[in-house]
């Protein structure tokens, strides 16, 4: 069996839909993969569902489309221990939260654990299409036979996409962008205190701003777009909208953006 988490989102292909925990995105594509079980996110007691018959657990380190749901360090470490005890592969999906977004190169580093398999995408390609499946040699080697070359792709390793990804990695390292992410996120958070905000959830420079209703969110997003701030509501959490600025955003642009968001909130 495979274990995933309720309200998770892993993509739109057959396999990734099968392990995504939002039925509204899946119903039109059934039947999907069998023997996929969904448990509650960030609930240590639910980890008892993991057993020796569990092939893998797949999880977004930070649930993105569910509205920036951040697990506790206690939960993450208990998950790692349980997977190790049952010889279950732990797969962490950092397609949204990886590449410095949380203030670490990889979000799992915040919790002091290491997965067996890591998936990356989005920011990895620096604007070009690029995804990555990262694992130790023994796991990667298992994919190289039965059948031989059974996992290949026409455009895998595309030179231009790889060059863009490498350039982005070098800039993240050379310009020390990641070390400033937490301070920039904290600055923006202090500027977004408002009576119309029900809850603000943040990790690094990834925010979810929860309002009273999806209608209120749509009004704020529309005003922000019209005034130069790009945002969007979460498809699986429409009462919240996302703020995920560039990691190298300046403090002055943070202040300008916050002013526009506050103006939008004032108009509710």
Regions inferred by a protein language model and the residue ranges of each:
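Conserved N-terminal phosphate-binding loop of PLP-dependent enzymes in the Aspartate aminotransferase
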Residues: 1-268
């Amino acid at each position: 069996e495979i274990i995933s988490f309720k309200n998770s989102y892993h993509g739109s292909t057959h396999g990734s839909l099968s392990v995504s925990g939002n039925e509204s995105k899946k119903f039109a594509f059934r039947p999907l993969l069998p023997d996929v079980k969904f448990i509650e996110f960030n609930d240590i007691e639910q980890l008892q569902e993991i057993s020796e018959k569990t092939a893998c657990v797949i999880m977004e380190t930070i649930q993105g489309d569910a509205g920036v749901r951040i697990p506790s360090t206690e939960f993450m470490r208990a998950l790692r221990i349980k997977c190790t005890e049952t010889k279950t592969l732990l797969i962490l999906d950092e397609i949204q939260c990886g590449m410095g977004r949380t203030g670490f190169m990889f979000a799992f580093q915040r919790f002091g654990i290491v997965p067996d398999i890591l998936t990356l995408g989005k920011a990895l390609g620096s604007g070009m299409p690029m995804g990555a499946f990262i694992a130790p040699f023994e796991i990667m080697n298992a994919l190289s036979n039965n059948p031989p070359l059974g996992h290949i792709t026409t455009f895998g390793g595309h030179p231009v996409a790889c060059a863009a990804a490498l350039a982005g990695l070098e800039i993240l390292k050379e310009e020390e962008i990641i070390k400033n992410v937490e301070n920039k996120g904290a600055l923006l958070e202090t500027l977004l205190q408002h009576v119309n905000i029900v809850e603000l959830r943040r990790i690094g420079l990834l925010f979810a701003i929860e309002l009273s209703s999806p209608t209120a969110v749509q009004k704020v997003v529309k005003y922000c777009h019209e005034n130069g701030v790009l945002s969007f509501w979460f498809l699986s959490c429409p009462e919240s909208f996302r703020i995920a600025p560039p990691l190298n955003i300046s403090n002055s642009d943070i202040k300008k953006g916050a002013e526009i968001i506050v103006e939008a909130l004032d108009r509710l």
